[in-house]
UniProtKB/Swiss-Prot annotation:
Protein name: Venom nerve growth factor 2
Major localisation: secreted
SUPFAM superfamilies, alphabetized: Cystine-knot cytokines
Disulphides: C139-C203, C181-C231, C191-C233
Subcellular compartments: Secreted
Natural source organism: Pseudechis australis (Mulga snake)
Family label: Belongs to the NGF-beta family.
Length: 242
């Protein structure tokens, strides 16, 4: 009986000694540990490489301040914005070069170099002054297309006018057709054709409001601004004749 017990104990001890050791109990310098270390290093290197490539493909988003500065320097306008009738005016024009001196009754339009050149030629043919009819204006006026950097809006505030507009990858300038007085006193007595014995007269400009593309912060917006549109004669009755 005792021999049987000894035999079972010895067999049990031999089985424990012959069982493979687990990786958790492997000494630090064993081949199993080296394989795990190499695998971890390779995986870490691969993760770093993947992360670097990901950063290159998807750079970190820029700061909001940088984005605002970039948008302010190069504002792109949607062409559909100009198709709305309430934004159209015959005195506002967007063109790549200075438009002709004549003003037609068309709405907001965009001219390329060829169209503007053709209209310049037509303007020279159609706008010759007529001197043989004996007709004279009470006040002498001058009309021209101009650009503006600032203007007064309908609320009386000074606003920044957008000069250059990026539209379909082309830069257009915003022009305004203004009419001003050439001289406040076309004749020594004031307005032409006014009886200076009874009236005191002088020429002055009048203004109206048109929709223009302006800057509000870093965004472009439409506003009513004031421009010169006519030259009229102002008369007052002399008090000596009352």
């Amino acid at each position: 009986m005792s021999m049987l017990c000894y035999t079972l104990i010895i067999a049990f001890l031999i089985g424990i000694w012959a069982a493979p050791q687990s990786e958790d109990n492997v000494p630090l310098g064993s081949p199993a540990t080296s394989d795990l270390s190499d695998t971890s290093c390779a995986q870490t290197h691969e993760d770093l490489k993947t992360s670097r490539n990901t950063d290159q493909r998807h750079p970190a988003p820029k700061k909001a301040d940088d984005q605002e500065l970039g948008s302010a320097a190069n504002i792109i306008v949607d062409p559909k914005l100009f198709q709305k009738r309430q934004f159209q005016s015959s005195r506002v024009l967007f063109s790549t070069q200075p438009p002709p001196l004549s003003r037609d009754e068309q709405s907001v339009e965009f001219l390329d170099n060829e169209d503007a050149l053709n209209r310049n030629i037509q303007a020279k043919r159609q706008n010759h002054p007529v001197h043989d009819l004996g007709e004279h204006s009470v006040c002498d006026s001058i009309s021209e297309w101009v650009t503006k950097t600032t203007a007064t809006d309908i609320k009386g505030n000074t606003v920044t006018v957008k000069v250059d507009v990026n539209l379909n990858n082309h830069v257009y300038k915003q022009y305004f057709f203004e009419t001003k007085c050439r001289n406040p006193n076309p004749v020594p007595s004031g307005c032409r054709g006014i009886d200076s014995r009874l009236w005191t007269s002088y020429c002055t400009k009048t203004q109206t409001f048109v929709r223009a593309l302006t800057m509000e912060g870093n965004q472009a917006s439409w506003r009513f601004i004031r421009i010169d549109t006519a030259c009229v004669c102002v008369i007052t009755k002399k008090t000596d004749n009352l």
